[in-house]
Amino acid sequence: MTLVRKIAYNIMISAGARLVGIALSLVNIGFIARYLGQEGFGSYSLILVFLSLFNILADLGLYSLMTREISGPGANEKEITSNIFTLRVVILLILLVLAIIAIWFFPYPVQVKIGVVIVTLAILFLSASQVLMGIFQKYLKTDRAALAEVIGRAFQLGLSILFIYLDLGFFAILLALVVGAGAIFVLNFFFARKYVPVTLAFDFSYWKEVLKMATPIAISLVFTLIYFKIDSIFLSLGFINRSSGNPISDVGIYNIAYKVLEGVIFFPAMFVGLIMPLLSKFAFWDRDQFKKIFQKTLDVLIIIMVPLVIGLLLLSLPIVNLIGGKEFSVSAPVLQILSFAIGLIFLGNLFGVSIIALNKQKIGAWIYLSGMIFNIVTNLIFIPKYSYIGAASTTVATEFLVTVLMIILICRTIHYFPRFNVIKPFIAGLAMGLFIYYFHNSNIFLLVGAGAIIYFAVLYLIKGIKKDEILSLIEK
């Protein structure tokens, strides 16, 4: 199979499997949200957010670093992957122990504190799985990771439905999460060892070298993901979220919409992840080729981004009702606001990876630090008065600031300002939007399917998308 076909195959299979995984995840969230209600789902979400902060600290950019290092000529893949994998697990174990200790100092219900203890195992499984993605991307076998995720999500959904039917309560739902995450890790580890014999490795001198290389990336990731997650922590604390009668319920309301955001931004992360080795390859020895790949990737992301944003703006209420039930209809305005953040995140994925490829992580870290400080300050200003609406608005403003700063850095580095070809996608999106608005009372699945057909048909007719351009991106 040629490189063109391999990349195209991986994109299609991974995207398809990822869509199935997202669907399973959203169905699972629907069952859980209906079973637990606003406050119970808020507790469930808070546990995941709290632990994700410690997972973020353990990330250290090792996933991106592994992809870059094993893509280099003459790389010792076994030593690199085994040591980075082991380093990630060791650091995470230390931080998860700290998380278990720290949670008891927060003013949360006891079920949240016990839940954190249970879910630490799931976070360990998912974190270990994530770092293995570098292997699948190097060998263009991301379909294996996608299959593992689908199976794991199916396990979790099946157990959740069973436990809800048996009315086993809150902690049983958390157990289903742990089992699903364990299944994903076991499968990913099995698949990864077919290409690289990953083992536990303790080359401390190499660990020191990796930590030195990873520090700028790690700092950037920590800053980025903290401002992604800290809003839920602020919402959960009554002395900050002073306008709320039930801060934990507000976390549930906010996270129903946020789960949609996390689901739909898979495409840019997956697509840009496959393009990253090419950007890294051409970043220094063929800058013109780098610019071409960068521009074509940006064009594809804009084409996908526009209908997503418009669709979420118009279908926010039926989407949140479908996922969480009418009890969560108050989440619709949150999703409408976050739809703009989704558009910015699409662009930010490409810009962030390009900064790493251009070896500008240290400057990038200052950008993410600025974003984190801005996010924390604005959250502390707006959450006390506007609760989850303030949190969502702050997320959009932060993404806008970070995106603009990344564009400036990239332009100064490669002496090239990218073209934002949005006019034709916007025209096609407007046609799609008019259809959805006119038939808004129709079945949501019909609206999504027909809307997508209308969008791409109009885009093709006005020559906003060409098959040759997509193939050209892959070839380059």
Labelled PLM ranges:
Residues M1-L3, I7, D143, N188-F228, ...:
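Interhelical loop/hinge segments that connect adjacent transmembrane helices in multipass membrane
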Residues L3-Y63, L96, I100, R153-L157, ...:
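Signature of the first transmembrane helix
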Residues N10-S25, G152, A176-G180, I184-N188, ...:
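Transmembrane helical elements of multi-pass membrane transporters/channels
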Residues V20, R88-K229:
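Hydrophobic transmembrane helix module of multi-pass membrane transport proteins
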Residues I29, A58-A75, K138, L261-L298, ...:
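Helix-loop junctions and terminal segments of transmembrane helices
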Residues E69, F125-A148, F171, S339-S370:
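Membrane-interface junctions at transmembrane-helix termini in multi-pass inner-membrane proteins
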Residues I103-V119, I248, Q295, L312-G343:
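Interfacial segments at transmembrane-helix termini and the short loops linking adjacent helices
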